[in-house]
Amino acid sequence: MNIGFFCYEYYPLLVGGLGTYAIEITRKIKEFGNDISVFTLNDGNLSTYEIWNGIEIHRPMLVNVMDIFPIVVKEDLRRWGWHLKFFADIYTYNILSATKFVNLLIKKQRRKFDIISFHDWLSAFSGIICKQNTNLPAVFHIHSIEEQRSLGGGSG
């Protein structure tokens, strides 16, 4: 099986449990004889492509969208302050990852994938875009909900 795997947190950029899970599950998927292409965030200091432990990793180089992003997002997002840069980077990572997966790997290189796996809301944009443009089956993994992250208080 050939799997497209989208997770904003992956080796070597780990923030918490999501990245640890992603590393362990992709390692096991590979051990079972499957091929896996991981799409993850690039902090600007990493290779845009590498094979690590037999796992293909794509890290698109981000562009700065902060001059335009506040103009095109809703008011509630503009109130995020410096967190808006994080969201802009996440959104850009998703668009670039989906574009590379659909246009380069599938359309140009004619690679065959069996399923798309995308993890948490941080990679949901790319997973949904890839699903809509390829009609591949997709699995969306939710790793926690806001109530769990904020000890029941929400972000409001």
What are these regions (language model features)?
Residues 1-61:
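N-terminal subdomain of nucleotide-sugar transferases
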Residues 3, 115-117, 130-150:
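Active-site proximal beta-strand in glycosyltransferases
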Residues 14-18, 130, 151-154:
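Short, solvent-exposed loop/turn segments at secondary-structure boundaries
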Residues 37-110:
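A conserved catalytic-core segment of Leloir-type glycosyltransferases
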Residues 70-71, 149-155:
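Short acidic, glycine/proline-rich loop/turn micro-motifs
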Residues 119-124:
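Short, solvent-exposed amphipathic helices
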